[in-house]
Amino acid sequence: MKKLGRIHPNRQVLAFILMVFLSQVRLEPIRYSVLEETESGSFVAHLAKDLGLGIGELASRSARVLSDDDKQRLQLDRQTGDLLLREKLDREELCGPIEPCVLHFQVFLEMPVQFFQGELLIQDINDHSPIFPEREVLLKILENSQPGTLFPLLIAEDLDVGSNGLQKYTISPNSHFHILTRNHSEGKKYPDLVQDKPLDREEQPEFSLTLVALDGGSPPRSGTVMVRILIMDINDNAPEFVHTPYGVQVLENSPLDSPIVRVLARDIDAGNFGSVSYGLFQASDEIKQTFSINEVTGEILLKKKLDFEKIKSYHVEIEATDGGGLSGKGTVVIEVVDVNDNPPELIISSLTSSIPENAPETVVSIFRIRDRDSGENGKMICSIPDNLPFILKPTLKNFYTLVTERPLDRETSAEYNITIAVTDLGTPRLKTQQNITVQVSDVNDNAPAFTQTSYTLFVRENNSPALHIGSVSATDRDSGTNAQVTYSLLPPQDPHLPLASLVSINADNGHLFALRSLDYEALQAFEFRVGASDRGSPALSSEALVRVLVLDTNDNSPFVLYPLQNGSAPCTELVPRAAEPGYLVTKVVAVDGDSGQNAWLSYQLLKATEPGLFGVWAHNGEVRTARLLSERDAAKHRLVVLVKDNGEPPRSATATLHVLLVDGFSQPYLPLPEAAPAQAQADSLTVYLVVALASVSSLFLFSVLLFVAVRLCRRSRAASVGRCSVPEGPFPGHLVDVSGTGTLSQSYQYEVCLTGDSGTGEFKFLKPIFPNLLVQDTGREVKENPKFRNSLVFS
């Protein structure tokens, strides 16, 4: 059918699609026949074989039979492929007098879409007898009527058609009349009574005859009516209609009691024989219910609403009768003019309420449209909104399929309300709309998406195991199981990272937990990837990076690297009494395993044998003289340096230093024990003797050890090795503190030469031998620093 109206540009591609679609429609219909009144469930044909389809294909492709009208009178057995009757078929009810009686149907298959046209011819059986509308007919004939005159009689009706329909009329045997069966222009057979010889009222004033209507069935059926013939006195002229037939057109929406037409008949006789009255002649019940005629004026009035869609024209026979009983016949042909009073109809044959989002060209609905009006009033345009991903495909006989134009996206729109509009081309235009709701079923086409591509989590060290340290979150735009997200830890890229023992993740909610207590000093940070997978088929997944930064806590106290805190052999620093204020005695070197401000170290002098003599620089731990030394200052000093970090709460450590004041580096010295209490000096002479004896013995042993050490040093030509002046207790020459105060500023070396004279028993230190002390500066020449010549500094 040619589609009228505006064609949207977006629909121009439909022409090609339509050509492809129509190629799936079988144009030549398959034809079957069945006798009317056949029992329901009766076999009609083996449809699958006739269509060249396998029996299993009918079920797999959802084959079904669609009829042109609203009733489904046929059914398809998908298991056997047989076409069966759903109900008894009454040809007279379905088609009336129309012959042949054909029931049109379509066979629809999906995947791919195919249409097959079918026609079922309903064959008539002789199940109706001819019936006359009245039981008796009164016929008045003038006695001067001539032989050969025809007198119309009542028509019998037979609902059967063809050979089973009305074929002829007969009348009971008599000598004055016989029946002539004639064919009307409408195809009906009319009986006319033919006069065979003159009549004589005085001889026989009345005849009673039986009119028989016979059909052509086997055996034939018949109907009868009694015909009474009255012989009338002479009335020379019968009424004659001025115009016959009359033709008139009436709008189907004309109001009741509207005048249709006025007929006029004249009788040239005088008196009562010239008086004419009008009436309906041999009118059917339908005509009697629809029209009436004024007996005096001959005006035909409308008694019942007209309906063009049911009856398009009426043939009304009018009889004009004079006072003498003569009558004339006239015909009025009333044509009903169609008006656009029927909106289009939309009949849905198949509807799919849910379709998958990834299936283009999916059939959503199959429907047909019709308009009971005619002409332009019956032409229709079917459309849907342009902004929907659906298209209408016309098939045949006003059948349409609604299919998806492209793959749908449930996440964009999970439901579509489609309004199918059918508009006729009448004036005014009438429209019918049908709303269809289509649910889009989800397909797993969206992977879970993390809210962030990377997450940074902070965990303070020494945490409790199973501590919740953070969460990751991913969402999936799908629905149902396709949107259920499961979290997991992915294998780390670093094979040495024991991820399985560090963290775990809750698979349901993405919460991350620390499995053990973390130690900043062992592991400052680590990163890993987490995965989020949905439960679709196949499952989709995504990844995100998680960085875990371990926050330091002040859980490490400062550790003193130098001087070594060895209680058995403490280090002793030598300071010449001639040292200037600010003289560097030594440097306390400490480290802290923490970081940040927890590792910022500060130094302070906690205890001193003589307060005010020495000072400690707070930032670098350098111990320097605070003033000039004097002879009154004690020779031995004990300093306790406190090293404290900047944590909260702060942690600390102490370093004990022994300082020995010497007049010159040539005099012997030994680390002396702690000063005796004041009360222990009572007997000074005894103490001096004991000390002298111990000193001589110790010096001897010490001298031997020094001699051996010097020999070894000379052989190995070791450069500078910072050592305490006491045996044992070596320490490294360069130390680094984490607070940024640097290392020991210098490296120093010295030699001690020991000579002994057995005759005198006197030890003498030789003048110390020093290498040139060099001061190096980046980018400068190396120069000798004379300031340190012939001086000894211990660090």
From Swiss-Prot:
Glycans are attached at N183, N417, N435, N566. Keywords: Calcium, Cell adhesion, Cell membrane, Glycoprotein, Membrane, Repeat, Signal, Transmembrane, Transmembrane helix. InterPro entries: Cadherin-like_dom, Cadherin-like_sf, Cadherin_C, Cadherin_CS, Cadherin_N, Protocadherin/Cadherin-CA. Its main location: membrane. Residues 1-27 form the signal peptide. The chain crosses the membrane at residues 690-710. Residues 711-795 are cytoplasmic. It is found in: Cell membrane. SUPFAM superfamilies: Cadherin-like (SSF49313). It comes from the Eukaryota. Residues 28-689 are extracellular. Residues 34-132, 137-241, 246-346, 351-450, 455-560, 567-670 form the Cadherin domain. GO terms for cellular component: membrane; plasma membrane; synapse. PROSITE patterns: CADHERIN_1, CADHERIN_2. One of its GO terms (molecular function) is calcium ion binding. It is a single-pass type I membrane protein. Potential calcium-dependent cell-adhesion protein. May be involved in the establishment and maintenance of specific neuronal connections in the brain. This is Protocadherin beta-4. It comes from Homo sapiens. The lineage of its organism: Eukaryota, Metazoa, Chordata, Craniata, Vertebrata.
